Amino acid sequence: MAANIQQQFGEQLLRAAQVVEEQIDQEMNKLENLEEDDLEVIRRQRMEQMKKAQKDRIEMLSHGHGKYEEVADEKEFFEATKKSDKVVCLFYLPGNFRCKIVDKHFEILARKHVGTRFIHVNAEKVHFLTTRLNIRVIPSIAIVVKQQTVDYIRGFDELGGKDEFTTETMENRLARSEVLTVEKKHTAPAKKKIIRSGVEEYDNEEDW
């Protein structure tokens, strides 16, 4: 009698263990399926992001991003700022030594920061633009974000006041205006200002 009870009890324990094991297996399968589904969703999202990034990159390259180019006149300048959300433009004079220094740095940055368009224009050929933007110092750099001129770099005062500044110095100064992004500790954001025109006096070393 006692042996039968013990046997029945053992069988019940075995069945209970089997039920629990089956339930665990079912839950594990659910978790595995859920993880697979999640991974598939993540994979699809990542693929879409990569496709969009590639499409955006191709479009930007077709608009002149990735290289440092000259624009001939006001029309080309405004076309560049319409097609690209972020534009950095050097106003130069032929033969100006400091403009050639900026050229060297912009050649590097244009290849590195494809999301930003780097251009230069002969200040003598865009009188309307230099008047509108109050360009009085050469070299002057206009920073345009979403068709608004948000900042200027006039001369080399903000770059250390010397000719021998690094590309990183220029890069960090541009990052303060949020026209490009750099991976570093932190950059103090520059105070944003929209400058359409106006009369401002600049006491820089190269008045034009």
UniProtKB/Swiss-Prot annotation:
InterPro entries assigned: Thioredoxin-like_sf, Thioredoxin_domain
Locations listed in the record: Nucleus; Cytoplasm
A single Gene Ontology CC term: nucleus
A GO BP annotation: microtubule cytoskeleton organization
Tissue: Expressed throughout the body with high expression in the nervous system, including the ventral nerve cord and tail neurons, and vulva.
Role: Required for normal microtubule organization and function. Regulates tubulin acetylation in ALM and PLM neurons.
UniProt name for this protein: Thioredoxin domain-containing protein 9
Organism of this sequence: Caenorhabditis elegans
